[in-house]
C-alpha cells in the first residue's frame, strides 16, 4: 500500500494544473501535466493485482487520455489560425484522427534491406540518425508529408519499434515501447517546467535546481527514482539526535570532513566508500543518516528494498545502476539503504532466487565502484557516500560487509542520552514543576529511543484523557483549545506511561549485537 500511495502522490495536483493551463490557453503545458498523470496511473496499474481495481483505473486512464486528445486538437486549431494562409498546401487531404498511426516524413520511412527477409508491414524499423539520406516511402503513402498547418498531435513522434516476429507479440512490443517513449517525452518537458515551479516554491535550499543533470539511457527510471527516493532537504540536525556522540564523531569524520577539507583526504586518507550502522531497532540509525545529509548539505537518497523491486527481468539491476548514476549527477550525495539485510543477505542460500542474486551482484559492483576522486566541471569533488542500516548485521553478505568499510554500533541510549531525549521530546509541551527528568531516565533503563518517545507521547496525552473522561461526543467537540491544552505534563503522567509502555528490545538481542561488534566491528 505504501508503494501505491507513492505512485499516486501528486496525481490530483497534476490534473488540476493541467486543466487550469488548458483553460488559460497554455495547451503545451497542459499536455505535459496530462502526460505526467497518465505515467503515474501506468505505474500504479503495475502494482495492482485486483481485476476490479485495475478495470476502474483503466477507465480513469481512458477518460484522461480522451481529455488530453481534446486539448491537443484545440492546440492544433490554435496553431492553424496562427499560420499564414499562403503557407497551406493546395488540396491537402483531410487527416484521419481515427487512424492507427500518424504519418511520418518521407526520410523517416523504413525500407527492407536488400537480400534480407521481407519485414512485417505492421512493424516499422527504428529511424536512422543520418538526416542527409533520403529514402523512398512505403507504397501508397507518397505525398503524405506533414505540413506546418497540421496539428501538434499529427506532428508528434510516432510509435515505432524494432523488427519483431509475426503475430501478437510484435503488437505488444510496439504498444509498450510507444508508451515508454511518450512517457519519456512527457517527463523531459515536465522537467523544464518543474525548474520554474521549484524555484518559486523554494524547495531547494540554495535556490538552484539540479534536475536534468542525469545523462544516461534510463531516463524513465531516473525520473522515477527522483520522485520516490530523492530527498534534498531531510531537515534533521545533530541537536535532534540525543546522545550517540561517538557515532556522530565517526560519521562526521567519514562524511562531513571530506567535504570541508578535500585537500587533506587524498590518497590513503580517501573518504570511506560505505558506512554500516547496526544495532537494536529504534536506536536512531535512520535519524543519524538524515542528520548526516543535512549537516554536510548533500543530496539524500532514501532507498529501501521495495524501491528496487520490479517484476520485469533485469529491471531491478538497471534501477541499482541508475540510482548510483543519479547520485553522481547530484554529487555530493548520500545513498541511505535502510534494512539492507532484506536486500543483500548472504548469497548461496537454498531459497535464493536468481533475480535476487543478480541484484546483489549489481549492488556490490556499484558500491565497490563508487569513486570519490572524480570531480565536477568546477573542480569540486564528486563525493558519493553509501550509508546502510540494519537490525540483523549477521545476515549481510560478507562481500558487502567488506565494502562497507566502517561498521558502527548504535547502542541503546545511556542515562545522559535518555535525559537529553526526554528534554527533546518535551520541548513543545508544558511540563509541571514536580517532573523529575533524572528519575524518569533512571526508571527507563533498557528502553530504546523509540520506546522513550512513546513514553513521553503517552504521558503528554494523559491530561487530555482526564479532560474528556465521561463527556459525550458533542461536549468534546464544543471544548475550546485552551480547555484541553492548559494541563501541563505531571510526574504522575510519566509513572502511568512507564507502567503501560514496556521496552521493545530484549537483553538477548543486545548480546548478539555486541558479539557481532567484537567480531566484525570497525569503528
Swiss-Prot record:
Disruption phenotype: Severe dwarf phenotype, with small and round dark-green rosette leaves as well as wide and short petioles. The ipga1-2 ktn1-4 and an-t1 ktn1-4 double mutants have an enhanced phenotype of pavement cells, resembling soap bubbles and no lobe formation. Disulfide bonds: none annotated. It is an enzyme of class 5 (isomerase). Its EC number is 5.6.1.1. Its main location: cytoplasm. It is found in: Cytoplasm, Cytoskeleton. This is Katanin p60 ATPase-containing subunit A1. It comes from Arabidopsis thaliana (Mouse-ear cress).
Amino acid at each position: 500500500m505504501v508503494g501505491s500511495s507513492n505512485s499516486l502522490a501528486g496525481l490530483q495536483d497534476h490534473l488540476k494544473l493541467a486543466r487550469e493551463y488548458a483553460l488559460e490557453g497554455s495547451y503545451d503545458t497542459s499536455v505535459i501535466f496530462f502526460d505526467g498523470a497518465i505515467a503515474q496511473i501506468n505505474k500504479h496499474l503495475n502494482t495492482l493485482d485486483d481485476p476490479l481495481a485495475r478495470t476502474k483505473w483503466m477507465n480513469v486512464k481512458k477518460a484522461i487520455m480522451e481529455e488530453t486528445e481534446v486539448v491537443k486538437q484545440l492546440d492544433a486549431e490554435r496553431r492553424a489560425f496562427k499560420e499564414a494562409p499562403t503557407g497551406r498546401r493546395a488540396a491537402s487531404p483531410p487527416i484521419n484522427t481515427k487512424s492507427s498511426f500518424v504519418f511520418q516524413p518521407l526520410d523517416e520511412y523504413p525500407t527492407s534491406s536488400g537480400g534480407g527477409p521481407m519485414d512485417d508491414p505492421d512493424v516499422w524499423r527504428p529511424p536512422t540518425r543520418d538526416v542527409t539520406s533520403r529514402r523512398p516511402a512505403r507504397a501508397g503513402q507518397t505525398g503524405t508529408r506533414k505540413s506546418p498547418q497540421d496539428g501538434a498531435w499529427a506532428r508528434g513522434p510516432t510509435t515505432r519499434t524494432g523488427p519483431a516476429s509475426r503475430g501478437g507479440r510484435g503488437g505488444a512490443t510496439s504498444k509498450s515501447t510507444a508508451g515508454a517513449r511518450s512517457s519519456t517525452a512527457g517527463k523531459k518537458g515536465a522537467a523544464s517546467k518543474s525548474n520554474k515551479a521549484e524555484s518559486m516554491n523554494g524547495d531547494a535550499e540554495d535556490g538552484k535546481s539540479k534536475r536534468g543533470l542525469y545523462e544516461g539511457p534510463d531516463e524513465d527510471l531516473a525520473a522515477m527514482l527522483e520522485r520516490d527516493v530523492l530527498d534534498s532537504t531531510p531537515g534533521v540536525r545533530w541537536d535532534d539526535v540525543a546522545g550517540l556522540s561517538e557515532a556522530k564523531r565517526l560519521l562526521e569524520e567519514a562524511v562531513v570532513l571530506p567535504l570541508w577539507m578535500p585537500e587533506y583526504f587524498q590518497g590513503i586518507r580517501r573518504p570511506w566508500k560505505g558506512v554500516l550502522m547496526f544495532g537494536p531497532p529504534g536506536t536512531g540509525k535512520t535519524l543519524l543518516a538524515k542528520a548526516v545529509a543535512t549537516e554536510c548539505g548533500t543530496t539524500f537518497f532514501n532507498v529501501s528494498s521495495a524501491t528496487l523491486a520490479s517484476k520485469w527481468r533485469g529491471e531491478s539491476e538497471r534501477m541499482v545502476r541508475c540510482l548510483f548514476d543519479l547520485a553522481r549527477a547530484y554529487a555530493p550525495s548520500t545513498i541511505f539503504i535502510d534494512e539492507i539485510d532484506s536486500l543483500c543477505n548472504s548469497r548461496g542460500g537454498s531459497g535464493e532466487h536468481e533475480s535476487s542474486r543478480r541484484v546483489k551482484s549489481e549492488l556490490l559492483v556499484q558500491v565497490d565502484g563508487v569513486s570519490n576522486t572524480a570531480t565536477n566541471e568546477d573542480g569540486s569533488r564528486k563525493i558519493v557516500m553509501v550509508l546502510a542500516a540494519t537490525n540483523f548485521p549477521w545476515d549481510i553478505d560478507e562481500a558487502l560487509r567488506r565494502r562497507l568499510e566502517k561498521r558502527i554500533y548504535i547502542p541503546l541510549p545511556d542515562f545522559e542520552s535518555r535525559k537529553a531525549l526526554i528534554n527533546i521530546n518535551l520541548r513543545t509541551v508544558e511540563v509541571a514543576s514536580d517532573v523529575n527528568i533524572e528519575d524518569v531516565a533512571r526508571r527507563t533503563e533498557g528502553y530504546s529511543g523509540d520506546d522513550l518517545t512513546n513514553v513521553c507521547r503517552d504521558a503528554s496525552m494523559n491530561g487530555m484523557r482526564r479532560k474528556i473522561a465521561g463527556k459525550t461526543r458533542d461536549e468534546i467537540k464544543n471544548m475550546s483549545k485552551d480547555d484541553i491544552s492548559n494541563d501541563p505534563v505531571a510526574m504522575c503522567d510519566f509513572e502511568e506511561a512507564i507502567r503501560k509502555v514496556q521496552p521493545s528490545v530484549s537483553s538477548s538481542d543486545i548480546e548478539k549485537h555486541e558479539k557481532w561488534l567484537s567480531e566484525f566491528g570497525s569503528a
